[in-house]
A protein has these predicted regions:
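Phosphate/anion-contacting hairpin/loop surfaces
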Residues: 2, 41-184
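Extreme N-terminal "head/tail" segments of very large remodeling/mechanoenzyme assemblies
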Residues: 1-59
Length: 184
């Protein structure tokens, strides 16, 4: 399982390698998995994003995975919106086990716009969520209704938010005194 510090390192490494890169291919080889092919100045990369309950992962790979002949709806939606899009940034909000990919693309009218692909690496609660800049959910790889979760719904049209973590502190941005106080 990933922790916030590991995800911070991943965000830094992915940002370094993928920022400015264009998404040339989007595949969904498994029901809870995406494989993005990205062409950047650093080279060509395959980025695997998995929201598997048993093994959520994000990693760069050289391996290509076979995809179904008919792409699932979530994959088709991503292709429509962000295929050919440019990755602006890969960030981690507030030491959470979340990676946020900011993607700039052209809409149907040829206007530049931004979208966010958010990967939550939280064990059985892992998900991949596609959002607008004002945090409206366009769609997600797993739909979570009010019957499934009393904390939040992850459905198209709903607001995206990160459930509040009680009293979490960011060890990477704390000064020495706060860090020592937290440990004692």
């Amino acid at each position: 399982a990933f922790d916030g510090i590991t995800v911070a390192c991943m965000a830094h490494e992915l940002h370094k390698n993928l920022s400015g890169g264009r998404i040339s291919k989007i595949a969904q080889p498994e029901t809870d998995e995406l494989l993005l092919t990205i062409k950047s100045q650093e080279g060509n990369f395959r980025l695997l994003l998995s929201a598997s309950a048993s093994l959520p992962l994000v990693y760069l790979t050289q391996t290509n995975k076979p995809s179904p002949l008919t792409a699932p709806n979530f994959c088709m939606l991503l292709r429509k919106h962000i295929s050919g899009g440019r990755i602006i940034a890969v960030t981690q909000p507030s030491m959470e086990r979340i990676l946020r990919f900011e993607i700039e693309h052209l809409d149907e009218m040829g206007d530049q716009c931004r979208k966010f692909l958010i990967v939550e690496l939280m064990g059985k609660y892992s998900n991949i969520i596609f959002c607008t800049p004002d945090d409206k959910i366009i769609d997600s790889i797993k739909h979570i209704s009010a019957q499934i979760s009393s904390v939040r719904e992850v459905l198209p049209g709903r607001d995206y938010f990160i459930p509040q973590a009680a009293g979490k502190k960011d060890p990477l941005s704390s000064d020495e005194a706060v860090f020592k106080e937290t440990l004692s």
